[in-house]
A protein has these predicted regions:
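Short, glycine-/aromatic-enriched active-site segment of Class I SAM-dependent methyltransferases
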Residues: 122-144, 155-156
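Short, hinge-like loop/turn segments at secondary-structure boundaries
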Residues: 58-60, 135-138, 182-186
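A C-terminal cap/extension of S-adenosyl-L-methionine-dependent methyltransferases
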Residues: 132, 171-234
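Active-site phosphate/pyrophosphate- and oxyanion-stabilizing loops and adjacent acidic/basic residues
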Residues: 29, 105, 151, 155, ...
């Protein structure tokens, strides 16, 4: 389940791509598929997530010619030289960071001139509903510390040395799922409504029925849970 359209971005053969806050590697595998001649690095602070990502990468490594690697480090101080990467992906990370503008400076530093920066984060009003329904949702350790507005995010990111290209929204069908989880936060693991809706999402992800994909795309401009943005380093 990807939160970007990688068909919009072309990078040189043999390019280097960083997935900042890669988690268990969801976007690493999409990157490996789209850019088989690139070298991919996943960076995260969570050792167990990196272990799972490495196991997945070992399975998918046959689809890339250049390889993939993982490192545990902070997005505030990355162990890479200036101008190292052709693209940096940062999906659903910035909303967790207290000093996210420091991370933007670090991303700008490790990107090559004219390199691409692809951030995503929760869309404003679907996220606002989650905060309204459950205080625990955004107060849990490591949770979301802010809600971005689209124009605010574009202006702030642009002020750190990036040119805005475009944006789009994804995962509309996930918004009601998170609303249900927030509504029944204390019992979400056993709640039948949450379980029933989760089964619909699992069907969409694993089986990809056409009617659910079409419904998701129709609703994305209004209901999309995540907003993805495309920037280029000045």
């Amino acid at each position: 389940m990807l939160t970007f359209d990688f068909n919009k971005i072309e990078i040189p053969k043999g390019g280097k791509i960083l997935d900042l806050g890669c988690g268990e590697g969801r976007h690493i595998f999409g990157i490996m598929d789209k850019y088989p001649d690139s070298y991919c690095i996943g960076l995260d602070l969570h050792a167990e997530s990196l272990k799972i990502a490495q196991e997945g990468a070992d399975y998918f490594e046959s689809i890339t010619n250049e390889g993939v690697g993982f490192t545990m480090a902070s997005g505030y101080q990355m162990p890479f030289a200036d101008s190292s990467f052709d693209m940096v992906v940062c999906s659903e990370v910035l909303e967790h960071l207290i000093n996210y503008e420091d991370a933007l400076d670090e991303i700008q530093r490790v990107l090559k001139p004219n390199g691409y920066f692809l951030p995503s984060f929760p869309s404003f009003w679907p996220e606002r509903v989650c905060w309204f329904l459950s205080e625990d949702y955004h107060n849990m350790p490591g949770g979301h510390v802010r809600i971005f507005r689209k124009k605010q995010a574009i202006n702030v990111i642009s002020s750190h040395g990036f040119n805005f290209i475009s944006h789009e929204r994804f995962h509309a069908l996930h918004a009601p799922y998170w609303w249900l989880r927030c509504m029944f936060w204390k019992t979400q693991e056993t709640n039948k409504l949450v379980a029933a809706y989760k089964s619909i999402l699992e069907k969409q992800i694993l089986q990809k029925p056409l009617y659910l994909d079409i419904l998701d795309k129709i609703l994305n401009p209004i209901l999309g849970k995540s907003i993805a943005m495309y920037f280029q380093k000045k």
